[in-house]
Amino acid sequence: NQSIALAKAGVPVYHAGIVGTDGDILLDACKEAGVDTRYIRRMPVKGGHTMIQVDKNAQNCIILYGGTNQMQTKEFVDEVLADFGEGDYLILQNEINMLDCIIDQAYEKKMKIVMNPSPFDDKLSTCDLSKVYLFLLNEIEGEQITGFKDKDQILDAMAEKFPNARFVLTLGSDGAVYYDGKEKVF
C-alpha cells in the first residue's frame, strides 16, 4: 500500500521483497501504479499475509502468517541495498525478517530509514531503532512502544526515546499528527 501510494503521488519507488505463488495481484498492482519491481523475487510457496480482526473494544487484533515475508536473506539484502545510498529513503514494515540487518546496512549507507512498526512484536527489540529517521505508527503501536494511550504522551515518549527521529502518529478518523520533537502539526 505504501509503495503504491507513493508512486501514485509521483515519487519514484522501488519495491523489494519476496512474493509467493499468490503474488500476481501485488505485482500487477505495483506495476500498474508505476512501482519498479526489479527487486521483487518469487518463491514457490505462499506469500505472507495479515488478517485484521476487530475485538469487542473496537481495537484491531492482527493475525500474521509470515510466508515469503520471512524469507529475506543477507545476500538478498546486500543485493538490493547495493543500488542505493546516501539520502535515499527506505520504508520498512515489521512484517519482514532481517530488519536488524537491513536497518544497520541502510544506516551505514546514510539512507533515511522510515519504520512502520506494524505489526508490533518483540522482534523490534533486536533492532537499533535509534537509526530510524521517521516512525509511521498508529495509536495502538504507540501504546505498545511507550505504554501511553494519550497521543501527546505517546509522541513525547517517542521523542525522548528516539531524539533524532521524526514521527507520524495516525489517529484513525481523527487524522494524524506529525512531530519533529519540537512542534506537533495536526
Model-derived regions: residue spans:
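Conserved phosphate-binding/catalytic loop of the ribokinase/pfkB sugar-kinase fold
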Residues: H15, I40-R42, I52-Y89
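Short beta-strand scaffold segments in enzyme catalytic cores
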Residues: H49-Q53, C61, G175-Y179
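Short, well-ordered alpha-helical microsegments
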Residues: G23, M98-D100, D121-S125
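Short gly/ser/thr-rich secondary-structure transition/capping motifs
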Residues: G34, Q70-E75, V114-F120, F148
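Substrate-binding N-lobe of the ribokinase-like
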Residues: N1-H49
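Conserved phosphate/ATP/ADP-binding segment of small-molecule kinases
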Residues: E108-K112, S118-V185
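Glycosyltransferases and closely related glycan-assembly transferases
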Residues: G85, D100-I113
